[in-house]
């Protein structure tokens, strides 16, 4: 069926009425009255548990949300994506990052062409190159083994590899991995300064080989290599992830060190492609394939499971409920796993660049809010930074906890138990809160004077009823990481279909790029600032004055 705008509008109205009149108000009471609440509002896929029972929903909420998914034709749009249809309508492209991890022998067609052999060919080339670097068969220009990899990229060419490489640290048995993204010269200077060009491989990740930040940093790195080892050494110390073979050749990188990908892979969905080359070099091709396999398992589940048993669908529906119906403008991603410390930033790009839109697929203004602000930090660090606001602030911010049942350090299992206890405690505290009477009783138990009890007790009250959901898996290994990322990718897709927007373009980044190009000669003093707004003129003048001071 097609998207039913009339039914969709009616269901949204019913959801808003339900939120105002009959959604759970007291979560303590909801759990007390319903011992089966956890069982009804949780799902498992193998060892991965998704619990949303602490969110303010009931059976009526879930029935209406499923009705919403049907009206938005989530299933039809999902089928269109997997079939290679051009669902990215503003760029007239297919959206097939799922093909990058499809290990089946079936066809995946884009405009009548089966892309799976192409995917396999690139993956095999990546594996051969990674094995060569890791084993020392592929050496630097002076014959030394490569000990360090520097990936130069930005956005999707950086955030995914950074996040995955850090997450899979226990599996590193290859060269050390470093990442440069910012145009700020401090980033590349600090990264290269402790390294030796003779044992360093630099990967330049830019599909067009024109991205200004990436290519500026790449030229700096090229000079670093050439000045030390000579111009002829450049080819042995660089590789590229790009489709612009002419530009790569002009840079001095041999074609056998160039790895391509396709326009049906968006940057923020590209860690599964050749963009993941630094990850593969760090952890090895076998572990990288396990990473792909985990994502593929989630793809199959998302494609085949019925709506009410489908983890990405339910995660997306809860996300929509919080954003569009409850009016929560933000969501916090809190992984209780230090190695997932870059996951919030990765999901921030995935979600906000995808669903931060204000027009529908047909170019009309949206009728309600779209994607939320996504942010976060790992636990327990966040508890000592911003959790105060999450518990007692005036804004309600849903939290999404992620924790593993087992850590990688058996001799530190007691610390992992403390980590898990903190995660569950925060989830429970947000839901239960603490009443004024409970605060008084706690203070009275300390034998404080009555006047002091009355003065302090209001400050120790927690409203509770603050929603959170929890994801638990066995252990953060390559398979689990791939599955987790794919879960969030498909969640973003589900929310976008209900919002009625295109999750796969990013026109919002263009205007700033254009103006930066215009302003570069102004900032450098080659052109004047006349014709620009008064604020920009004033800022330029101040910068010029301070640079001369």
Swiss-Prot record:
One of its GO terms (biological process) is glucose 6-phosphate metabolic process. InterPro entries: G6P_Isomerase, G6P_Isomerase_C, Phosphoglucose_isomerase_CS, SIS_dom_sf, SIS_PGI_1, SIS_PGI_2. Keywords: Cytoplasm, Gluconeogenesis, Glycolysis, Isomerase. Pathway: Carbohydrate biosynthesis; gluconeogenesis; Carbohydrate degradation; glycolysis; D-glyceraldehyde 3-phosphate and glycerone phosphate from D-glucose: step 2/4. It comes from the Bacteria. Its EC number is 5.3.1.9. CDD domains: SIS_PGI_1, SIS_PGI_2. Its main location: cytoplasm. GO terms for cellular component: cytosol. PROSITE patterns: P_GLUCOSE_ISOMERASE_1 (PS00765), P_GLUCOSE_ISOMERASE_2 (PS00174), P_GLUCOSE_ISOMERASE_3 (PS51463). The active site is at residues 353, 384, 513. It catalyses: alpha-D-glucose 6-phosphate = beta-D-fructose 6-phosphate. It is found in: Cytoplasm. The keyword Cytoplasm applies. Catalyzes the reversible isomerization of glucose-6-phosphate to fructose-6-phosphate. This is Glucose-6-phosphate isomerase. The gene is pgi.
